Amino acid sequence: MAVMDAEPATTGPAGLIARLREKLTGGSSEASLTRRLAGTIFVIRVISAGLAYFSQVLLARWMGTSDYGVYVYVWTWVLLLGSMMDFGISASAQKIIPEYRARGEHALLRGFLSGSRWLTFAVSALVSLGLAGLVKLLSPWIEPAEELPLYIGCMTLPAFVVANTQDGIARSHDWMQLGLMPQFIIRQALIIGITACAFLLGYHLGAVAAMIASAGAVWIAMTGQMVVLNRKLAGHIEPGPKAYDVSGWLAVSLPILLVESFYLLLSYTDVLVLQQFRPSDEVGVYFAVVKTLALVSFIHYAMSATTAHRFAEYNASGDKARLSAYVAHAINWTFWPSLAATIVLLALGKPLLWLFGPQFVVGYDIMFVAAIGLVVRSAIGPVERLLNMLGQQKICALAYALAFAMNLVLCIALVPHFGGHGAAAATSISLSFETVLLFWIVRQRLGLHVLAFGK
């Protein structure tokens, strides 16, 4: 069965529009389904980006650059740790659930759908208590303005982790809206609503108030997502006994956790190192630049979220030609939209940064440095998901570890002297290095060409 849809030989404006509509929504093949799901995810992420951008603009203007910088620093820790504390189960769900379904192991499937969430909640709650104790222990060396926001961040983590796990479960059933909307739209809307109410009521909107609003938004969104997910699962899977293969889950998840952890460390090292060497207001400017370019990474995220469980299915069926065509399709639909989005964002960079405040426009030239790495990385598409789903988690984790180590060394070397420019340069160089490594690994291990151009 062909993976790619045939293109009608229509010409003229009407024909071009028809072909574009067919490209995006037509057909019944896996490629068409992937485009529709990826389009859904991309729309959700774009709306989320708009809400997040709006909320960050409001917070930056209401809080000032210094308080905003503290909030950004603490929230970055929440994003980093919260995304690592699920053992990789949110990602491995896209491998485990399709395999259980294919093998008819319904008891194990039911056990995973409930047990994975209880497991991640219990462990993340214990780890959060330990982290709060660590903050208390290190309080003499922590800036006073950061201490209370860090405690609030610890309280946020369990809900954040469970939401990630539920996202993975929902995506494995192709319920993209349920997986993503609570985290990326409802949560952002709640943050805007809570902080706006506090501001209008005359409360001082500092880093503490912003973190309280963010924590409340995370818990509310996660709880609502849990209620809806449980109802959908009840109608999708027949009741019956549950079996729990925790060791088997962890055997799949922990190598993926290594990949995800090094990816996250690579993503957030620049902000965390910048906070150690530069003033909080400079961190705020750099974060505004990163937020402005976030649309580019959303395209990669959309394709990753829709293709991972397909990679696992096609590999299990043994159809390498089908897998190869699907991989090429995913790469093309990652790179070319990413390139177009980068060009548009760079063209509109100054007015977008000005929305945060006139003082944020100084970060415009940093955008060009940061954009290089994003475009280079998009040229190989979601190959990290391909490696994870095809049992190459360890070598993929090694590639990310090397890229993270390079990024950390470069950030420490460049940030003290060049600030945000140095952080952006370090990240772009590291992303380019990671791209070369992943391309070579897939070529050697899987024999697949994973570049948007050439053979």
What are the residue ranges of the model-derived segments?
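Signature of the first transmembrane helix
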Residues: 14-15, 33-91, 128-132, 156, ...
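Membrane-interface junctions at transmembrane-helix termini in multi-pass inner-membrane proteins
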Residues: 160-183, 372-399
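Helix-terminus/linker motif at the lipid-water interface of multi-pass membrane proteins
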Residues: 53-67, 199, 203, 261-295, ...
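Hydrophobic alpha-helical transmembrane segments
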Residues: 151, 181-233, 402-406, 420-444
